[in-house]
Amino acid sequence: MQYGLLIGSGFWRSSTSVRDWPLLMCCLSLPIFPLAAFLVEKLAQKNYMTEYVVVTLHIIITTASILYPVLVILRCDAAFLSGVTLMMFACIVWMKLVSYAHTNYDMRQLARSADEGENSEINYSYDVNIKSLAYFMVAPTLCYQLSYPRSASIRKGWLARQLIKLVIFTGLMGFIIEQYINPIVRSSQHPLKGDLLYGIERVLKLSVPNLYVWLCMFYCLFHIWLNILAEILRFGDREFYKDWWNAKTIDEYWRLWNMPVHKWMVRHIYFPCLRNGLPKGVAVLISFFISAVFHELCIAVPCRLFKFWAFLGIMFQIPLAILTNFLQNKFKSSNLGNMTFWCFFCIVGQPMCVLLYYHDVMNRNGGSS
């Protein structure tokens, strides 16, 4: 170990300090927005308001569910980890509320068409109830539907083993951050300033521990935590990711690595764009734009620094997808596209973003960590 043993609890303890209590209270109050959406849908089902009013109210509710946490984070001097956690919860709530509104809108339209005599042989009746919404809000899915596949029982022994794995790999992730990433970042320069060769050396040196942390994060979140949540709720659909590590193109990677978000994007962004006559390329551009906005919110708001590095990083995936598609079509039997993905996305892209945000935050704070 080049820097000696550097394990400490400061990084994690900072996220449980008294100054972060407003963020905890904000997180605990987020369920008010699903409750408001439920009341709107209940009134809409009873025809107490027009469709225009329903859509307007849902826009207000979903917008408030994002702006409220943003304002709380910006007003409080909270730790970065606490801010990221709150923003991720807020983004999940926003996506679930959009899906809830879209699905109920479709069900109302189908019910009305049946009442008017169209497809009268099919029963499109549905019930807006708080139980289904509550289950959806805690289930490991972003797409609302009236029912989900359910497992027969909860495997308690399996659940205990997964909890142990979660503790172990979370600890490993913290160890790598404290022992390797923090010293490298603190001894680095701004990647867009100073000596070019030294900057490249820092990025490449950071790439290995950063990759390990990212893989640990993926394993903890998608393989362990979402399966734990699914097991507790007896949620039957466990397809949270596919073999993204074998992706030969960037767009294939984005279709495989985060299945809940991918399914949400396809159902609520991509297909609605196509149904409204937009070309496929424009639909893809809109999907990446929305993804870029939320990536930027999850990083920039906790940093209180809007330099749009995360936004640009996601939007850069579009030309990178075109490049990897070209390479895959030209060299069909090679893994050149896969190597390009690993190089640009994992080895260069993520360490660059870490260094950019770190040094911009340090510059804003006058160099104090």
Task: Describe the role of every protein-language-model region.
Residues 150-156, 308-319:
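Compositionally biased, low-complexity linear motifs
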Residues 16-167:
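Intramembrane catalytic core of multi-pass membrane enzymes that act on lipidic substrates
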Residues 1-8, 29-44, 62-75, 91-103, ...:
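Membrane-embedded alpha-helices of multi-pass membrane proteins, especially ion channels
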Residues 1-24, 40-54, 69-85, 176-212, ...:
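Membrane-lumen (extracellular) interface motif
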Residues 54-65, 259, 280, 287-292, ...:
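Alpha-helical transmembrane segments of multi-pass membrane proteins
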Residues 119-165, 170, 187-304, 332-369:
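Membrane-interfacial catalytic/cofactor-binding modules of polytopic membrane enzymes
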Residues 83-92, 288, 310-317:
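Hydrophobic core segments of alpha-helical transmembrane domains in multi-pass membrane proteins
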Residues 104-109, 236-241, 327:
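Juxtamembrane/interfacial segments flanking transmembrane helices
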